[in-house]
Design a protein with these regions (language model features):
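Active-site-adjacent "subsite" loops/lids of carbohydrate-active enzymes
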Residues: 79-108, 112, 161-166, 184-188
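Conserved, mostly hydrophobic/aromatic
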Residues: 37, 120, 183-185, 224, ...
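Active-site beta-loop-alpha junctions enriched in small/polar residues
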Residues: 19-21, 42, 76-78, 123-125, ...
Length: 335
């Protein structure tokens, strides 16, 4: 017996995103299984001034450090009203004064608050800002690394270099993967709020993305995204009208039990789903369970990845963390 862990268990970096309104209990239960706690999120102004989250995140930083987990500052293009803005990205990445201000502010905040790194989570970058964004990431990474802090970049799930679409065109996978210390490939949201019912992270789609990612970026730098949530769709699905409800994975099982639903398993997506009826409305639910998680964690071994990044850890999914600890020796801060 090897102490209840898999033979030849390897090291991996396990990261989890969380908002400052996370319950202290959930945070305490999850941190032992995390290498990095990615705190969501810091915005900024057009001049490059950092905007802290509305709620204080100090307790998260302290708890992370006491668990030998690295607290990471997530930088997002959120404006003063908390809205995502790709106009804001354009204005800042093309303005050296704003970049200098933002880097100084980031460094100051990271030092003063006790963060150990920065995660750059910019989405929908314009194709015309592609090169400016690379330069922006390079400047942040150089300054942070010189001061002993790491930088990661989040990447949309591409399957080819010239993939069209707003999510993809502004991200130069190869260049960003070379510059950043690590990347998160966001392998989830195939099933999403406004889309048709399907698995959030079907393994066949995840594989396609990883197959491409490892041609551009060294696997030792890649964290694959794993969703810690599911969706409940009212049926029939009507595009533009139907809106799925986000649910937790434990909650999904509870809904199935309460409605006497049979949980099925899709062998192509390697994901669980079920149908139920309530108040005369049919529903279709897709979520993650220990089987789907096990399939995803296996990919870290198969592709030799850095590890996994969970969006997000707000709801406790205990069986997931047991699987993580069984399969990986989770990297922790070296003292």
């Amino acid at each position: 017996d090897n102490g209840g862990v898999r033979a030849n268990r390897r090291k991996a970096y396990i990261r989890g995103f969380a908002y400052p309104f996370i319950s202290k209990y959930v945070l305490d239960e999850t941190l032992p299984s995390l290498s990095e706690l990615t705190i969501f999120s810091y915005g900024f102004t057009e001049e490059g001034y950092l905007l802290a989250p509305h709620l204080d995140d100090t307790f998260m930083i302290e708890k992370a450090l006491s668990n030998m987990t690295e607290p990471i500052l997530t930088l997002t293009p959120f404006d003063r009203s908390g809205n995502f803005s790709n106009e804001l990205i354009s204005k800042v990445v093309n303005n050296q004064d704003a970049i200098d201000t933002l880097i100084a502010q980031l460094l100051n905040t990271v030092k003063n608050k006790g963060f150990l790194g920065v995660d750059i989570d910019f989405e929908y970058i314009k194709a015309t800002d592609r090169d400016a964004f690379v330069k922006f990431v390079r400047q942040i990474t150089e300054t942070m690394n010189e001061n002993g802090y790491s930088v990661s970049v989040d990447l949309a799930p591409k399957i080819s270099a010239d993939q069209p679409g707003l999510l993809y065109e502004g991200k130069n996978y190869g260049a960003l993967g070379q510059i950043a210390n690590s990347v998160l490939v966001m392998t989830y949201e195939w099933g999403y709020t406004y889309g048709p019912p399907m698995a959030v992270a079907p393994i066949n789609k995840v594989r396609q993305v990883l197959d491409y990612a490892v041609t551009e970026i060294e696997p030792a730098k890649i964290n694959m995204g794993i969703p810690n949530y599911g969706y409940d769709w009212p049926l029939p699905f009507v595009r533009g009208t139907t809106k799925a409800k986000t649910i937790g994975n434990v909650e999904a099982v509870r809904i199935a039990i309460e409605n006497n639903a049979t949980i099925e398993f899709d062998e192509t997506a390697k994901s669980p789903y079920f149908f139920y009826e309530k108040d005369g409305i049919s529903h279709e639910v897709w979520f993650e369970d220990p089987r789907s998680i096990k399939e995803k964690l296996e990919l870290i071994y198969e592709y030799n990845l850095r590890g996994a990044s969970y969006w997000q850890i707000m709801q406790l999914f205990r069986s997931n963390w047991l699987l993580v600890d069984y399969n990986f020796n989770v990297e922790k801060i070296k003292m």
